[in-house]
Amino acid sequence: MPLHRTRIKLCGLTQPADVDHAVAIGADAIGLVFYPPSPRYVAIERAAELAHRAGPFVTVTGLFVNASADDVARVLDQVPLTLLQFHGDEPAELCAEIAGKVGLPWLRALRVQPGADLVEFADRFATAQGLLLDAFVEGYGGGGHVFDWTLIPPQWLPQSPSLPTTSAAPRLVLSGGLSAQNVAGAIERVRPYAVDVSSGIEAARGVKDHARMTAFVRAVREADAALGASVQA
């Protein structure tokens, strides 16, 4: 039995069949994008349908970029979200204010680039339930790129393959260019609380591929099992 279970968020779902498949293969969370320029954007009416299909034990995450409190409340009038993800330039005070008004936990995304002070960022957003680390690109979103994992503070990483992450680490959600081919290495190196994937499970931008979704979830579970076996060996 692995000592660590990596949670899995499949983001940017737009079709009912995608949500049904995510639930069937054991995803812990799905992500719905409420940022109109994104190819994965979903209108409120469609999002409400998708969220209801997720059922009671899958976290439904709403991704917002520089949205106002009124924007978020308008979505929540129809969409039963259970987690907010702020993916723009929102300051900590605004994130906490919006989440407090609607009574939901929240994540804050950081687009990682050389020179970024992740420890200072984590301190500023200490009231978030987790930090999502994504690749930096112009605009918003990671664009399917992997960022340099050596930029993650060493005190946040496991001290050896057989040990969990240290208590100094925030709840990290690792994103940015993940796929079934590289997620095992990410888990072994970073040991994140969760992994988040979007483009890595697509056949084309905004079009999810069920075989890739299945392969990604399988790769995460196998990586967790391998880490558990190495601890017990």
Swiss-Prot record:
GO biological process: L-tryptophan biosynthetic process
Catalytic activity: N-(5-phospho-beta-D-ribosyl)anthranilate = 1-(2-carboxyphenylamino)-1-deoxy-D-ribulose 5-phosphate
Gene3D superfamilies named among the record's database cross-references: Aldolase class I (3.20.20.70)
Matches recorded under InterPro entries: Aldolase_TIM (IPR013785), PRAI_dom (IPR001240), RibuloseP-bd_barrel (IPR011060), TrpF_fam (IPR044643)
Example GO molecular function: phosphoribosylanthranilate isomerase activity
Entry EC no(s): 5.3.1.24
DNA damage is among the record's keywords: no
Keywords from the UniProt entry: Amino-acid biosynthesis, Aromatic amino acid biosynthesis, Isomerase, Tryptophan biosynthesis
Pathway assigned in UniProt: Amino-acid biosynthesis; L-tryptophan biosynthesis; L-tryptophan from chorismate: step 3/5
Membrane spanning stretches: none
Pfam families in alphabetical order: PRAI
Classification via CDD domains: PRAI
UniProt similarity note: Belongs to the TrpF family.
NCBIfam families given in the database record: PRK01222.1-4 (NF002298), PRK01222.1-6 (NF002299)
Designated name of the protein: N-(5'-phosphoribosyl)anthranilate isomerase
Gene that encodes the chain: trpF
